[in-house]
From Swiss-Prot:
It comes from Coxiella burnetii (strain Dugway 5J108-111). The keyword Chaperone applies. Zn(2+) 1 binds at residues 146, 149, 199, 202. InterPro entries: DnaJ, DnaJ_C, DnaJ_domain, DnaJ_domain_CS, HSP40/DnaJ_pept-bd, HSP_DnaJ_Cys-rich_dom, HSP_DnaJ_Cys-rich_dom_sf, J_dom_sf. This is Chaperone protein DnaJ. The J domain is necessary and sufficient to stimulate DnaK ATPase activity. Zinc center 1 plays an important role in the autonomous, DnaK-independent chaperone activity of DnaJ. Zinc center 2 is essential for interaction with DnaK and for DnaJ activity. CXXCXGXG motif repeats lie at residues 146-153, 163-170, 185-192, 199-206.
Length: 375
């Protein structure tokens, strides 16, 4: 059976905020949680469906993938929602609100601050930038504390009042037969206070949307998959609560000359067949300038030369990798008739000589001969 749209499951629109998604899930969890519907298979299915939708829509990366590619995007990129198994521990504060007080066990009932959401930002770097490090300015759309009310949500000169329904606890106790549960107050949404005279700039939310400009220091040696945490640079919390963090995810672009493996750099170095046979010197580029590489006579294709200390300085240990040059011997092309004649004469000279000028070729033919004669 085809999966339902996650937004439809939770009953929210596609532009719903994280807080709205969480609120919708709380409502469904209260209604369909298995502990409140023992033996009801239909309720269990609906609860699992709501939980799966919540896990995707409250995760910024999963939600972006879902919005673009649907269910297939989440399954292919993240292994599907709830890939870690069906459990309740990862829903933390939501189940604290719903089942914080079972069988009369009090939990203290104090209002809880709603910390701002964490943000993710992908930073694309060149290989040179990743190896040497730099400072980069980035622009991040986010929520900041309202400067007019300093995040309180109340109009200047006024202040929030104690919620008349929960008396400032932020939570309400509900009795369902022998089961007593404690849930977030629907009036103050767990804050314990209400705004009677809201700030006109932020409309009582205590925060406003703004694009924040930040300077990020990129340490030398960083690589794709590494991330930098900027504490407190995420979204502002609701009504003056602490902000979340910003995680800068690094992605290094492919380089035309070098391929990185750990702290080593690899590069293909093409040489003509005369240099391979007679030897010579070449100018080899590195990320710190060029160096001279001596090619010894009779160098074969696939030969590797290791240039010590010309790789990447490790991000944590400080050890420096090497540059490994992979020799590629090129066969000449677009030969003139005269050049072809010289090569034919050269080939005849090699045949007349009893020396083994191509040991790998001879060994290969000997192996082929042995293979067929042994049949």
């Amino acid at each position: 059976m085809a999966k339902r749209d996650y937004y439809e499951v939770l009953g929210v629109n596609r532009n719903a905020t994280e807080a709205e998604v969480k609120k919708a899930f709380r409502r469904l969890a209260m209604k369909y949680h298995p502990d409140r519907n023992p033996g009801d298979k239909d309720a269990e299915v609906k609860f699992k469906e709501a939980r799966e939708a919540y896990e995707v829509l409250c995760d910024s990366r999963k939600r972006a993938s879902y919005d673009q590619f649907g269910h297939a995007g989440v399954e292919q990129t993240f292994g599907g929602a709830g890939a870690g198994g069906f459990g309740f521990g990862d829903l933390g504060d939501i189940f604290d609100d719903i089942f914080g007080d079972i069988f009369g066990g009090a939990r203290g009932g104090q209002a809880r601050e709603q910390r701002g959401a964490d943000l993710a930002y992908e930073l694309v770097l060149s290989l040179e930038e990743a190896v040497h490090g730099l400072s980069r300015t980035i622009k991040v759309p986010t929520w900041i504390n309202c400067k007019t009310c300093n995040g309180s949500g109340a109009k200047k000169g006024s202040s929030p009042a104690t919620c008349p329904r929960c008396n400032g606890s932020g939570q309400m106790r509900m009795q369902h037969g022998f089961l007593q549960v404690q849930q977030t107050c629907s009036v103050c949404r767990g804050r314990g206070q209400v705004i009677k005279d809201p700030c006109t700039d932020c409309h009582g939310q205590g925060r406003q949307q703004q694009t924040k400009t930040l300077s990020v220091k990129i340490p030398p040696g960083i690589d794709t998959g590494d991330r930098i945490r900027l504490a407190g640079e995420g979204e502002a919390g609701l009504f003056g609560a602490p902000p979340g963090d910003l995680y800068v995810q690094v992605r290094v672009k492919p380089h035309p000359l070098f391929h990185r493996e750990g702290n080593d750099l690899h590069s293909e170095v093409p040489i003509d067949f005369t240099t391979a046979a007679l030897g010579g010197e070449m100018e080899i580029p590195t990320l710190d300038g060029s160096v001279r590489l001596t090619i010894p006579p009779e160098t074969q294709g696939g030969k590797q030369f290791r240039l010590r200390g010309k790789g990447v300085k490790a991000l944590r240990s400080g050890a420096v990798g090497d540059l490994i040059c992979h020799i590629v011997v090129e066969t000449p092309v677009k030969l003139s008739p005269e050049q072809k004649d010289y090569l034919k004469q050269f080939a005849e000279l090699l045949k007349k000589d009893e020396k083994n000028h191509s040991p790998r070729t001879r060994n290969w033919f000997d192996s082929v001969k042995d293979f067929f004669t042994s049949k």
